[in-house]
Amino acid sequence: VSGTLYGLGVGPGDPELLTLKAVRILRTVPVIAYPAPLEGDGLARRIVAAHLPGGQTEIVLRMAFDPTQPPPEAAYDRGAAEIAAQLDDGRDVAVLCEGDPLFFGSFAYVLERLAGRYPVRVVPGIASPMACAAALARPLSARDERLVIVPATRCEDDLAATLAQCEAAVVMKLGRHLAKVRRVLERLDLAAGAQIVAWASHAEQKIMTLDEAERDGVPYFSLVVTRRTSR
């Protein structure tokens, strides 16, 4: 009998934002797997460190993180093969994923390689837009407002066309795309209420206006939250 593949959402960064179910699985599963840079621990591993019992087998998917490039297929191929070997031996494997596993999550790349071959259980996690709304203490949307969540990596015209159809928006993966996103928000009358959250729920969390972000710069893990109207 093969093991079960778990996609484990570990939340946006604060270790106390893991679900009870995620913590239970972390403490009982014999194998964990997670993406990490070429050197050092990955973010997901750091988030769960305090909850790990020790003695588990750890599969590290080493890869160069470059948001301008496609996902590193070879790294995911190797990682999926290592995970499959553990599952074939009857050992459950929990793949750690920042935020929610199926919302812009790295677990999706493992899942597409192993789905259909093993039992799969996905444990949802708190995604970054929800953590940003909590940090700002403001609703993402209300009543019948249309909410759009879109990555800043889209081209400017596509962003404008998408955001023109909504009353509330979250723009993710901001980083070097700040100037482009600001132009679009100003064109669509969405800039006035915009706030930026970097590293939501982390110790280094920072909340900024567009002007402050343009002056100081923003990391890749930054989001813009805005609404056209308030109610």
Describe the predicted segments one by one.
Residues 41, 77-80, 153-157, 178:
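Structural motif corresponding to alpha-helix initiation and N-cap regions
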Residues 89, 99-165, 215, 229:
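Class I SAM-dependent methyltransferase SAM-binding "motif I" and its flanking Rossmann-like core
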Residues 1-15, 20-118, 207-208, 214, ...:
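Class I S-adenosyl-L-methionine
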Residues 21-23, 84, 137, 158-161, ...:
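A generic local secondary-structure boundary/capping motif
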Residues 39-41, 66, 127-131, 178-179, ...:
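Short gly/pro/ser/thr-enriched loop/turn and capping motifs at secondary-structure boundaries
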Residues 5, 88, 163-231:
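A contiguous loop/helix-start segment that scaffolds small-molecule binding in enzyme catalytic cores
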Residues 34-35, 60, 95-97, 122-125, ...:
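General beta-strand structural signal in soluble alpha/beta enzymes
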